[in-house]
């Protein structure tokens, strides 16, 4: 009986030792991985302001996390595609995030801190970079229900509900111009989110607040279905 207990204690001690060693190894690997990530992030951030760095590496690592290297493919449905977006529009939005005049929820959480680190030169460089990227090519066909109805709203508006045609500012093909953003191929969820913000006044823009105040949720989805399919 005594021998059995001793062996049992010995096994427990060996297990405790192995668990401790495994824990130390895990902590060590975690520390090394974290250190490596910090190093890579630091190198990427250092490259942002370097005129000698290849163009993609001038993009802040903060931008790449959500918008991707080229701004074509985003990780989240409410994160906008930036590839091919108009320079003046992007500059205006980054400045609005920086001075907190664009104050929607995601802007406050994610974009305010990022924009605070950008001076005028970096804002211009980022706008130039993403503007120069080729917009994504959408596959043919309707990805979301309501695209047909959305096309009618976009091109003709809804006169009896005092909703003007979107194409008057954003162009017949949704390409936009100057201060009016490109909407063709934009993310479905992002369009709905921003129309909601304009509708309820969360995102302040005198023109869009007036236009979106009468639009229904169903109409938002239809317009988003059409634009995201372009």
Curated annotation (Swiss-Prot):
The keyword Cell division does not apply. Heme c 2 binds at residues 166, 169-170. One of its GO terms (cellular component) is periplasmic space. Heme c 1 binds at residues 63, 66-67. It holds the Pfam family Cytochrom_C. The keyword Acyltransferase does not apply. It is found in: Periplasm. Diheme, high potential cytochrome c. This is Cytochrome c-552. It comes from Acidithiobacillus ferridurans. The lineage of its organism: Bacteria, Pseudomonadati, Pseudomonadota, Acidithiobacillia, Acidithiobacillales.
């Amino acid at each position: 009986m005594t021998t059995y207990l001793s062996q049992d204690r010995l096994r427990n001690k060996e297990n405790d030792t192995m668990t401790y060693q495994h824990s130390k190894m895990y902590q060590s690997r975690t520390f090394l991985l974290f250190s490596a990530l910090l190093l890579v992030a630091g190198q990427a951030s250092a490259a942002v302001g370097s005129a000698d760095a290849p163009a993609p590496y001038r993009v802040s690592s903060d931008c790449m996390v959500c918008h991707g290297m080229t701004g074509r493919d985003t990780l989240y449905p409410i994160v906008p595609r930036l590839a091919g977006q108009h320079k003046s529009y992007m500059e205006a939005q980054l400045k609005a995030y920086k001075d907190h005049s664009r104050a929607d929820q995601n802007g406050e959480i994610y974009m305010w801190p990022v924009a605070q680190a950008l001076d005028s030169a970096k804002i211009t460089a980022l706008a130039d970079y993403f503007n120069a990227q080729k917009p994504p090519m959408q596959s043919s066909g309707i990805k979301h229900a309501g695209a047909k109805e959305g096309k009618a709203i976009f091109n003709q508006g809804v006169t009896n509900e005092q909703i003007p045609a979107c194409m008057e500012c954003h162009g017949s093909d949704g390409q936009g111009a100057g201060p009016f953003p490109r909407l063709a191929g934009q993310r479905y969820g992002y369009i709905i989110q921003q129309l909601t913000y304009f509708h309820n006044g969360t995102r302040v823009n005198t023109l869009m607040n007036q236009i979106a105040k009468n639009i229904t949720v169903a109409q938002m989805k239809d317009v988003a279905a059409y634009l995201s399919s372009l």
